[in-house]
C-alpha cells in the first residue's frame, strides 16, 4: 500500500507542481540545492530562480532538470523515485517532522495515500494521516525541511490537483487542518477524518458528504484556519446523511434535527428545527424513503418538543407517528393527512385550537371510518352510541370521537386521505406525495377488506372482543384501512367527523373536546385544558379512572376502546374499546356494511348538529390542508395522542393516564359539567 500510495502521491505532485511553482519550486530549489550538490548538476545551475519559476525546467533541455523537480534529476528521472524523496521527506520532515515528531513522517506516506485514498475516501482515514503530514507541511514550511515537505506541499498541490485528484484535496484538507489541527493537536485530524468518515457514510447515503469533506479541504488551506467551522459542517452533513439514512431511526432524526437543524434548524429556531429536520431528513433520508419515518421522526421532533412541552402525551404522538408510520406506511402516510388536521390543530390547532381539533379528530375518525364504510360515522356513531348514553351525559360522545380519532389516528389518519380524495385527497395525495398516492390508489379500491386487515393492527382492540367491536370496529378498523377502501364514504365520514353524531348531541362543541384530546394531547394540553377535559374523558376513561366511575366508564369504554390497552385490561370496556380497535380488524371488515348505515345516520345526526358540525366539515378540509400540514405530520402525532391512548403502551398505563393527568384530570371534572 505504501509504495502504491507513494507512487500515486508522486504522480499527483508532479502533475500538480506546475500549478504551484511558488511552493514546490521553492522547495524544489532548496531540495536541488541540497540534493543536487551530490549529483553535481545542481550547483552548476546558476539559474535556480528560473527553476523556481518552474519554467526553467521546461525550458531547460536538461532531462535531469525535467525529471522531478526534486534535485534528484537522475532520481528525478525516476519520477517514482521522486517519491522516495518524499520518503526522505519524511526523513527530511524527520528534522522538521521531528519537531512535530517523526510520527508525522509515517503519516507522511499516508498523505500520499490519502491523496489518492482521500479520493477513495475510505482511505479517508489516511486523511488523518495526511493531517500529520499536513503538520509536516506546516512544520516543513517553517523550515527548509520543506523540500521533503515540498511533497507535502504537493499535498496542497493536491488542492490544486484537487481539480484533478479531488482525493488529494481531502488529504490536503486534513493537512491544512492538520496545521491548525496540529496546532490545537491532532484533534483537527479527527475532523479531517470526519470528512472521510462522512465520506464513507456520506458516500453511502450520497457522495454529498464527501463533497463536504472536499469543501473543508478547499477551506483547509484558507479555511484550515477556520476549517474547524468547515469540518463541523462537513460532519453535520455526514452526520445528517448517515443519521438521515439511519433516520429510519426517527430518533436519529431527532438527533440529526439537532445537528442538521442545529445549523438550519438553529437558524429558524427550535420550532423551525422540526420543520428543518423534516427537510433535512426528508432531503436525504426523506428522499430515500422519503420514509414516512422522517416525517414521523420530524413529527416526534416537532411534537416531541412542543408535544413534550405540553405533556408526555405528545411523545406518545411521536410514537404514534412511528407506529402509524408502519401501519401508516401500509395504508399510507394518510395518517399525516389526518395528522395534519391535528397538526394544524397541534400547532395551529393549539392556536384555535379545539375548534380545528374537533374537525381534525372527526376527520380522522370520521375520515377513516366515514371513509371506510363511512363506518367513520359509525365510529362516532358507535362511540356516540355508547357515549350516546354516557356520551350524552358527559358528552363523552366527543371522547368516543376522540377514540375514533385514535384508532383512525394511526390507521384512520391514513385512511382519511380517501375521504379527502374528493376534497383532501388531492391535497393529501399531493402533500403526502408519491407515498400517499402509492398507498392510496390501492386503498380506495376494495382495499377496505385490506383496510380491515390494517385494523388488524388494531388487533389489540380486536383481541379484546371483536364481537362488540363490530360497531366500534367500523370506526377504528375502518379508520385505518376502511378509510382507504372507500373514499366515497369518507365524505359521509366528514359529516360523521362532524362527530357531529356526538357533536350533534353535545353539539360539535363536544367533538372539539374529542378532537382536543387528540390535538389537545399535544397542543390541546398547551392550548387549554378545556379541550383536554373532553380529551380527559377519553384519556381518563381510557385509563382506568373512567372505569372506576361507572358513569364515566360508559364513556370510559369508548375511551378504553381508544385505550387499546384499557380495552384489553377489562373486556367489558374492551367491547367499546374493541369497537374501535378490534372492530377495526375483523369488525371493520364485516360490520363495515352496517357501520355505513350507522355512519349515514351519524352524518345525518351530525347534519342536524351539522350546523355546528359544519366546523367538522372544515375539519376534514383541514385534513386536506393537513396534507400539506401532513408533511408537518406532527399533526399525526396529535392523532398520535389518540393513538397514544391506542398506543398500547402509552394508553395502557402511562401515556393515557399522563394525558389525563396533564390537563385531562382537571378537565375531566369540567367536562362533566360542560356536558351537563
Swiss-Prot record:
Protein's cellular compartments: Secreted
Keywords, sorted A to Z: Hormone, Phosphoprotein, Repeat, Secreted, Signal
Annotated Gene Ontology cellular component terms: extracellular region
Principal subcellular localization: secreted
Region (Disordered): 29-676
Residue(s) carrying Phosphoserine: 28, 30
Annotated function: The parotid hormone stimulates dentinal fluid transport in teeth.
Protein name as catalogued: Basic proline-rich protein
Organism, scientific name: Sus scrofa (Pig)
Lineage: Eukaryota, Metazoa, Chordata, Craniata, Vertebrata
Amino acid at each position: 500500500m505504501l509504495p502504491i500510495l507513494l507512487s500515486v502521491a508522486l504522480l499527483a505532485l508532479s502533475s500538480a507542481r506546475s500549478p504551484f511553482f511558488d511552493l514546490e519550486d521553492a522547495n524544489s530549489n532548496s531540495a536541488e540545492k541540497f540534493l543536487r550538490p551530490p549529483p553535481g548538476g545542481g550547483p552548476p545551475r546558476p539559474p535556480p530562480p528560473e527553476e523556481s519559476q518552474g519554467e526553467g525546467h521546461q525550458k531547460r533541455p536538461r532531462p535531469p532538470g525535467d525529471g522531478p523537480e526534486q534535485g534528484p534529476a537522475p532520481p528525478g528521472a525516476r519520477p517514482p523515485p521522486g517519491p522516495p524523496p518524499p520518503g526522505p521527506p519524511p526523513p527530511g520532515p524527520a528534522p522538521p517532522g521531528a519537531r512535530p515528531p517523526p510520527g508525522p513522517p509515517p503519516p507522511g506516506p499516508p498523505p500520499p495515500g490519502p491523496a489518492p485514498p482521500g479520493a477513495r475516501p475510505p482511505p479517508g482515514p489516511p486523511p488523518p494521516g495526511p493531517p500529520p503530514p499536513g503538520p509536516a507541511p506546516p512544520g516543513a514550511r517553517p523550515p527548509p525541511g520543506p523540500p521533503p515537505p515540498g511533497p507535502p506541499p504537493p499535498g496542497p498541490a493536491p488542492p490544486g490537483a484537487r481539480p484533478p485528484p479531488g482525493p488529494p484535496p481531502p488529504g490536503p484538507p486534513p493537512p491544512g487542518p492538520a496545521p491548525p489541527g496540529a496546532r490545537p493537536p491532532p484533534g483537527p485530524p479527527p475532523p479531517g477524518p470526519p470528512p472521510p468518515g462522512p465520506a464513507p457514510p456520506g458516500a453511502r447515503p450520497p457522495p454529498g458528504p464527501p463533497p463536504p469533506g472536499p469543501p473543508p479541504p478547499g477551506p483547509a488551506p484558507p479555511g484550515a484556519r477556520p476549517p474547524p467551522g468547515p469540518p463541523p459542517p462537513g460532519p453535520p452533513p455526514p452526520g445528517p446523511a448517515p443519521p438521515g439514512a439511519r433516520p429510519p431511526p426517527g430518533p436519529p432524526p431527532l438527533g440529526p434535527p439537532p445537528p442538521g437543524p442545529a445549523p438550519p434548524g438553529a437558524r429558524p429556531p427550535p420550532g423551525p428545527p422540526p420543520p428543518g429536520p423534516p427537510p433535512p431528513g426528508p432531503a436525504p433520508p426523506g428522499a430515500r424513503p422519503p420514509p414516512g419515518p422522517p416525517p414521523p421522526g420530524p413529527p416526534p421532533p416537532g411534537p416531541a418538543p412542543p408535544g413534550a412541552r405540553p405533556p408526555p402525551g405528545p411523545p406518545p404522538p411521536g410514537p404514534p407517528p412511528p407506529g402509524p408510520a408502519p401501519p401508516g406506511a401500509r395504508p399510507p402516510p394518510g395518517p399525516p393527512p389526518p395528522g395534519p388536521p391535528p397538526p394544524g390543530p397541534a400547532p395551529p390547532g393549539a392556536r384555535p385550537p379545539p375548534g380545528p381539533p374537533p374537525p381534525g379528530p372527526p376527520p380522522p375518525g370520521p375520515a377513516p371510518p366515514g371513509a371506510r364504510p363511512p363506518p367513520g360515522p359509525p365510529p362516532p356513531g358507535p362511540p356516540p352510541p355508547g357515549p350516546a348514553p354516557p356520551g350524552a351525559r358527559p358528552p363523552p360522545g366527543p371522547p368516543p370521537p376522540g377514540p375514533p380519532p385514535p384508532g383512525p389516528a394511526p390507521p384512520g389518519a391514513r385512511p382519511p386521505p380517501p375521504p379527502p380524495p374528493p376534497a383532501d385527497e388531492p391535497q393529501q395525495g399531493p402533500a403526502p406525495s408519491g407515498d400517499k398516492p402509492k398507498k392510496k390508489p390501492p386503498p380506495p379500491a376494495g382495499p377496505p377488506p385490506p383496510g380491515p386487515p390494517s385494523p388488524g393492527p388494531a388487533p389489540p382492540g380486536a383481541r379484546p372482543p371483536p364481537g362488540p367491536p363490530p360497531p366500534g370496529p367500523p370506526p377504528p378498523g375502518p379508520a385505518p384501512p376502511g378509510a382507504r377502501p372507500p373514499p366515497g364514504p369518507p365524505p359521509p365520514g366528514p359529516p360523521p367527523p362532524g362527530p357531529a353524531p356526538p357533536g350533534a348531541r353535545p353539539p360539535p362543541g363536544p367533538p372539539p373536546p374529542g378532537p382536543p384530546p387528540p390535538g389537545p394531547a399535544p397542543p390541546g394540553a398547551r392550548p387549554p385544558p378545556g379541550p383536554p377535559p373532553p380529551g380527559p374523558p377519553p384519556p381518563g376513561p381510557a385509563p382506568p379512572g373512567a372505569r372506576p366511575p361507572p358513569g364515566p366508564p360508559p364513556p370510559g369504554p369508548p375511551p378504553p376502546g381508544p385505550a387499546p390497552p384499557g380495552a384489553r385490561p377489562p373486556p367489558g370496556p374492551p367491547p367499546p374499546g374493541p369497537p374501535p380497535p378490534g372492530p377495526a380488524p375483523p369488525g371493520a371488515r364485516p360490520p363495515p356494511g352496517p357501520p355505513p348505515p350507522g355512519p349515514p345516520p351519524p352524518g345525518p345526526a351530525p347534519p342536524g348538529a351539522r350546523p355546528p358540525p359544519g366546523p367538522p366539515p372544515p375539519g376534514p378540509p383541514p385534513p386536506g390542508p393537513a396534507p400539506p400540514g401532513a408533511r408537518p405530520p406532527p399533526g399525526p402525532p396529535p392523532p398520535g395522542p389518540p393513538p397514544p391512548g391506542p398506543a398500547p403502551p402509552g394508553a395502557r398505563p402511562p401515556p393515557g393516564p399522563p394525558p389525563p393527568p396533564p390537563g385531562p384530570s382537571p378537565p375531566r371534572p369540567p367536562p362533566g359539567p360542560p356536558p351537563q
